[in-house]
């Protein structure tokens, strides 16, 4: 379930709805914890760096994954991305083609990742990792999959939105947590808080008590975008569209209309026709996220035609600590080397 599809009370202080679901939440949390503890994860002959989160929905994992991949490639490593592929139709490991694959077939995030490095989607993450090793990758960056029980992770980096944090702190279905915090932190090697805010403080304290490093990062536009003073219709189908709108405003854009869709939304002809009409009526510039843009581009012809009239806001994740990417990648490689020596 995506954050934008989640019940609003998940992101508010706990109320009667959360407490009414507590029995189900407790059972789910117990099962999730047991699965994490009992997992028999396959170990492969390459370092595996997982970029995960503690809750459902978007926290900024993909920009962090791309930032670390770029740094690793500058170090001379051969990087491959591994993703489950949201809503994808492939049952076996599949190498993503950013030109030929559709968002419906492979998912939007894999299309973005494939523009940076070799990307494999696989419902069986261990099988997908083996495919990347066969292709010569010596560092596998797994976008999501922290709770997966199939693949051994040499380093698990948890991404937390500093503004939303853990929501009401309850485990699904009473809240957005995928498992209890203390249980998940047992398997984390580091934490990065995204953006400004203090909602992630509980995670920071938990990481500090466990002796895990904590980093901070933020999203910024990759280049000058010409949006200052422009009247725009901003639309997005991502986990947390408010972050996108806030970034647009920080660029100086005048957001006249906002249109939010569910996360990973596959736009229809009706959607794009309505957006075009609304923008034309007020003479507004259509602006969306990179994820939404690739979903439009890698779709049917009406959506591709519409994409030609849309500007994508290109962003990147930047660590506040200049040495953070190196520290994370080095830790993943060191853990892998130690693992290989024990074979």
From Swiss-Prot:
Binding-site residues for ATP, renumbered to this chain: 55-62
Annotated GO MF terms: ATP binding; tetraacyldisaccharide 4'-kinase activity
Transmembrane segments: none
Enzyme class (EC, first level): transferase
Annotated pathway: Glycolipid biosynthesis; lipid IV(A) biosynthesis; lipid IV(A) from (3R)-3-hydroxytetradecanoyl-[acyl-carrier-protein] and UDP-N-acetyl-alpha-D-glucosamine: step 6/6
Keyword tRNA processing tagged: no
E.C. number: 2.7.1.130
Keywords associated with the record: ATP-binding, Kinase, Lipid A biosynthesis, Lipid biosynthesis, Lipid metabolism, Nucleotide-binding, Transferase
The organism's place on the tree of life at top rank: Bacteria
Pfam families for the chain: LpxK
Catalytic activity: a lipid A disaccharide + ATP = a lipid IVA + ADP + H(+)
GO BP annotations, alphabetical order: lipid A biosynthetic process; lipopolysaccharide core region biosynthetic process
Family according to the record: Belongs to the LpxK family.
Function: Transfers the gamma-phosphate of ATP to the 4'-position of a tetraacyldisaccharide 1-phosphate intermediate (termed DS-1-P) to form tetraacyldisaccharide 1,4'-bis-phosphate (lipid IVA).
NCBIfam families hit by this protein: lpxK
Name of the featured protein: Tetraacyldisaccharide 4'-kinase
Organism: Chelativorans sp. (strain BNC1)
Gene: lpxK
């Amino acid at each position: 379930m995506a954050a934008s599809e989640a019940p609003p009370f998940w992101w508010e202080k706990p109320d009667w709805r959360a407490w009414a679901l507590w029995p189900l939440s407790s059972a789910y949390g117990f099962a999730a914890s047991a699965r994490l503890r009992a997992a028999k994860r396959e170990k492969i002959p390459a370092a595996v760096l997982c970029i995960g989160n503690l809750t459902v929905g978007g926290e900024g994992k993909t920009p962090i994954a791309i930032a670390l991949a770029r740094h690793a490639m500058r170090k001379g490593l051969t990087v491959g991305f591994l993703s489950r592929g949201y809503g994808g139709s492939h049952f076996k490991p599949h190498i993503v083609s950013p030109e030929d694959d559709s968002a419906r077939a492979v998912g939007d995030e894999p299309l973005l990742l494939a523009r940076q490095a070799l990307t494999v989607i696989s419902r069986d993450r261990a099988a997908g990792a083996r495919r990347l090793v066969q292709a010569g990758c010596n560092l596998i960056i797994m976008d999501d999959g922290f709770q997966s029980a199939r693949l051994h992770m040499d380093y698990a980096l948890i991404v937390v939105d500093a503004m939303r944090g853990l929501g009401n702190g309850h485990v699904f279905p009473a809240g957005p947590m995928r498992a209890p915090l203390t249980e998940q932190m047992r398997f984390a090697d580091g934490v990065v808080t995204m953006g400004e805010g203090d909602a992630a403080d509980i995670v920071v304290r938990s990481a500090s008590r466990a002796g895990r490093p904590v980093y901070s990062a933020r999203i910024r536009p990759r280049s000058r975008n010409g949006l200052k003073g422009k009247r725009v219709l901003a639309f997005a189908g991502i986990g947390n569209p408010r972050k996108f709108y806030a970034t647009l405003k920080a660029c100086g854009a005048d957001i006249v209309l906002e249109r939010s869709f569910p996360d990973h939304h596959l736009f229809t002809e009706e959607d794009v026709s309505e957006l075009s009409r609304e923008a034309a009526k007020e003479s507004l510039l259509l602006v969306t996220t990179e994820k939404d843009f690739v979903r439009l581009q890698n779709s049917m012809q009406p959506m591709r035609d519409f994409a030609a009239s849309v500007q994508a806001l290109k962003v990147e994740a930047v660590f506040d600590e200049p040495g953070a990417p190196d520290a994370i990648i080095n830790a993943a490689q060191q853990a892998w080397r130690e693992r290989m020596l024990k074979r």
